[in-house]
Design a protein with these regions (language model features):
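Helix-loop-helix units of permease transmembrane domains in multi-pass membrane transporters
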Residues: 95-127, 269
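Short cytosolic juxtamembrane segments of multi-pass membrane proteins
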Residues: 270-274
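Secretory targeting signals
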Residues: 51-95, 119-189, 203, 208, ...
Length: 274
């Protein structure tokens, strides 16, 4: 092998070494973030509230004489969605704020660590917490549905619905983290809640595209995430299959939105003076 080939192999090896080193730093920050959040009360409070929302559906079903199982089912999915999104907003909006208040970010950035890696580590730690939260609530919901339907009630469309709700919470957590890079934790929560509310009303925004403010609503429809893509509605209860390309498109759209939120957060924190 000539010298050019040897030099090329050496560059590739160094690239892998640097990439592995960066990944280890990101995973270390993610692990610390995960363990920090596990010690917080907000995680268990939201988890308890989510479990209560799932249980409320059982009591609400006794108020309906037509398809009480449907009441339990929709209460359960709504409770899981709201609980995961609430946890993503509350934790994502406060992750960076605590670092600025405690001045721990200054100590971290004194080390050979990129701010982008710091953001990624924080987000991946939050993803770990959201995954654990989602898994526990999903198990609780499946247990309740098995009791209500007197047997196993798990289908492919039901699993797809759970996964899409999980992706929705990841998007919201990413944008909550982005908002926290340039404002306070309280305002980040407010912005994230408004972001979530508007992102679930795209079908209603079409009716507002009239008059002089038509351009404004069109811009909002383009900029805001389409959270409606992650809600399958009554199709899940009646087990109506979704086209595979639609589900795959929703998954790719979720990764695109997460990438956009992290890119925006990285751009802001790189330009910020500490």
């Amino acid at each position: 092998m000539d010298s050019f080939g040897l030099d090329w192999l050496e560059k590739v090896r160094r690239g892998f070494d640097h990439g592995g080193e960066r990944m280890l730093k990101i995973l270390a920050i993610a692990q610390v973030t995960f363990l920090e959040i596990l010690r917080e009360k907000v995680l268990y409070n939201v988890l308890l509230c989510g479990a209560c929302l799932l249980s409320v559906g059982v009591f609400a079903s006794h108020l309906s004489f037509i398809q009480p199982q449907r009441v339990v089912f929709h209460f359960g999915l709504s409770g899981l969605s709201l609980s995961c999104c609430a946890l993503g907003v509350l934790l994502g909006a406060s992750l960076l704020g605590r670092e600025w208040e405690r001045k721990t970010a200054h100590l971290v950035f004194c080390r050979p660590l990129s701010r982008v890696h710091f953001i990624l580590g924080k987000y991946f730690g939050l993803v770990g917490i959201l995954s654990l939260h989602w898994f526990l609530l999903a198990l609780t919901l499946m247990g309740i549905l098995n009791l209500v339907f007197h047997g196993p009630w798990i289908s492919g469309i039901f699993f797809q619905a759970l996964c899409l709700l999980y992706l929705e919470s990841l998007i919201l957590a990413g944008f909550a983290l982005f908002f926290s890079t340039f404002t306070t934790s309280a305002l980040s929560v407010i912005f994230s809640v408004g972001f979530y509310a508007l992102g679930n009303t795209h079908s209603q925004l079409r009716f507002l595209e009239q008059g002089g403010t038509q351009w404004l609503w069109k811009v909002l429809r383009v900029v805001l995430p389409h959270f409606e893509y992650f809600h399958l509605g009554t199709r899940v209860f009646y087990q109506l299959p979704m086209p595979s390309f639609w589900v795959l498109g929703s998954v790719l759209y979720a990764f695109l939105m997460v990438g956009c939120s992290l890119s925006l957060a990285s751009a802001v924190i790189l330009s910020r003076e500490l």
